[in-house]
């Protein structure tokens, strides 16, 4: 009897979804971009499984062109895979593509009902948060105010590695803990007992958000949201995350209310953490839309989910590529050691002199953008690109990974070659559409300066203080597995395990 009811329910649900899908087929009269033929109900969703989505979309683009149309369930999806198309979306029609989809389950949960700067809809509220991010949270002055935190945390990181010289260490894990530590102190003022749990929850969310959710394919069928396992999984993790952040928020509020933050009062702006900045803005109330606690927590989530993953993933990939390319490793080490040999240690004073290291970072971001498929956008109004119609409300995906490997713009695009950036004016500020590791247009990542500061110093220190060898079970660098993991951000699937050997001129040698 139970099987009968289940079968009947499944059949009725199938018919309902089919009817909804057919009802949405009114776009067939439009001149849509080319794409693979869809099948009933699923559309092209079945073609996006069994591999990394950014790889699959790149391969499909080779056949159907750099501007593609796909159907994922009832959702019309436009995929951009070339610099020319990206320029149309991020420059020519920037305003039309400045929105985010409002029908993705995970977005609603993680953004505290669209209260953050990353997911909130385009409009006055988003402009307000964008201004706060650019002018107060991630300005050059603000990022520089955290210099002592970065230098202290990285120095402790180097000492910890040095204490284990000649032994195998999991460098990927150590880098991740370092970046989280820096971000935690910048955001909250201190590390606390919940730091490890905080990291664990963010890692779980990164994986959970990347899992397919049928409710996202059929957003008009609200019933699917009620039975979505993915939704409840994300909600459960996020609830635990929220509890930690709320405790930290309450602590900051109590401290401000009781005037106990004497160090902040004595030293002015320089000692304020990011939560202090947000709470001060909240108290001033000088924005059109009040900044409530949900907005503050949503922005904190942005800082950790975007900032930490971008930096730690990039440092990890850079070390992987240099291990695989020892000539490049040697050049980078020689540069850092030449600049800092007299000091015996790296600080941020002379980082601007490390031209080759900056090229290594740029090349790493080209080959391994932390978010290979930029967060989806939504077309606000029907428009035309390259003679094709882009329907209103269609979901838009830009394949930054494919664009960074476009052979029409990059010589030997699959090779790791930092020299290509030494005399190049290509940058990641959104003006070079062949290079979009941080996105482009109005929605470009507001935390670029913060992320880069957390990449440059750790890399420079790792290169200065140590020579590196693969662990004994990974002696063949040509066979170093560069397979990517699955998730919104793309790390290396296997952690990088190396053996450090102290550099003779390091001022820390023998003092670990």
From Swiss-Prot:
Its EC number is 1.14.14.103. Keywords: Alkaloid metabolism, Endoplasmic reticulum, Heme, Iron, Membrane, Metal-binding, Monooxygenase, Oxidoreductase, Transmembrane, Transmembrane helix. It is found in: Endoplasmic reticulum membrane. One of its GO terms (biological process) is alkaloid metabolic process. Its main location: endoplasmic reticulum. It catalyses: (-)-tabersonine + reduced [NADPH--hemoprotein reductase] + O2 = 16-hydroxytabersonine + oxidized [NADPH--hemoprotein reductase] + H2O + H(+). It is a single-pass membrane protein. The keyword Endoplasmic reticulum applies. Residues 23-512 are cytoplasmic. The keyword Isomerase does not apply. Induction: Not regulated by methyl jasmonate treatment. Its cofactor is heme. Heme binds at residue 445. Tabersonine 16-hydroxylation is orchestrated in an organ-dependent manner by two genes including CYP71D351, which encodes the T16H2 isoform acting in the foliar vindoline biosynthesis, and CYP71D12, which encodes the T16H1 isoform acting in the flower vindoline biosynthesis. This is Tabersonine 16-hydroxylase 2. It comes from Catharanthus roseus. The gene is CYP71D351.
């Amino acid at each position: 009897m139970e099987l009968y009811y289940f079968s009947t329910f499944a059949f009725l649900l199938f018919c309902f979804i089919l009817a909804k899908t057919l009802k949405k087929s009114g776009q067939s009269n439009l001149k849509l971009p080319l794409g693979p033929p869809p099948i009933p109900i699923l559309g092209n969703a079945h073609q996006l499984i069994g591999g990394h989505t950014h790889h699959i979309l790149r391969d499909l683009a080779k056949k159907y062109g750099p501007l593609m149309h796909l159907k994922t369930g009832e959702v019309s999806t436009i995929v951009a895979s070339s610099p020319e198309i990206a320029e149309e979306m991020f420059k020519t029609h920037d305003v039309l593509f400045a929105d985010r989809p409002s029908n993705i389950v995970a977005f609603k949960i993680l953004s505290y009902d669209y209260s953050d700067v990353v997911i909130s809809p385009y409009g006055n509220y988003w402009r307000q948060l964008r201004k706060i991010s650019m002018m107060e949270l991630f300005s050059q002055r603000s990022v520089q105010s955290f210099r002592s935190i970065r230098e202290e945390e990285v120095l402790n990181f180097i000492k910890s590695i040095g204490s284990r010289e000649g032994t195998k260490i999991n460098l990927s894990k150590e880098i991740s803990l370092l970046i989280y530590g820096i971000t935690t102190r910048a955001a909250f003022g201190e590390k606390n007992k919940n730091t490890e749990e905080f990291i664990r929850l963010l890692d779980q969310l990164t994986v959970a958000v990347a899992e397919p959710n049928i409710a996202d394919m059929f957003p008009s069928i609200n019933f699917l949201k009620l039975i979505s396992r993915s939704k409840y999984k994300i909600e459960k993790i996020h609830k635990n995350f929220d509890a930690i952040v709320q405790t930290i928020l309450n602590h900051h509020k109590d401290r401000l209310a009781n005037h106990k933050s004497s160090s902040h009062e004595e030293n002015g702006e320089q000692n304020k953490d990011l939560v202090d900045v947000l709470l001060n803005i909240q108290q001033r109330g000088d924005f059109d839309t009040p900044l409530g606690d949900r907005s503050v927590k949503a922005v904190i989530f942005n800082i950790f989910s975007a900032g930490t993953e971008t930096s730690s993933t990039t440092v990890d990939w850079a070390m992987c590529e240099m291990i695989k390319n020892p000539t490049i490793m040697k050049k980078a080490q020689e540069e850092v050691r030449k600049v800092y040999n007299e000091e015996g240690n790296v600080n941020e004073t002379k980082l601007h002199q490390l031209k080759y290291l900056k090229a290594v970072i740029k090349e790493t971001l080209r080959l391994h953008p932390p978010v290979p498929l930029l967060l989806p956008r939504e077309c606000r109004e029907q428009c035309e690109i390259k003679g094709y119609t882009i329907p209103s409300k269609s979901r838009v995906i830009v394949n930054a990974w494919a664009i960074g490997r476009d052979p029409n713009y990059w010589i030997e695009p699959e090779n790791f070659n930092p020299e290509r950036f030494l005399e190049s004016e290509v940058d990641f500020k959104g003006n070079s559409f062949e290079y979009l590791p941080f996105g482009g247009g109005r929605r470009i990542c507001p935390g670029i300066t913060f992320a880069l500061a957390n990449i440059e110093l750790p890399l420079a220190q790792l290169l200065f203080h140590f020579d590196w060898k693969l662990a004994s079970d990974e002696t063949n660098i040509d066979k170093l597995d560069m397979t990517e993991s699955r998730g919104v951000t793309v790390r290396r699937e296997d952690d990088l395990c190396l053996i450090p050997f102290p550099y003779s001129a390091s001022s820390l040698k023998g003092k670990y």
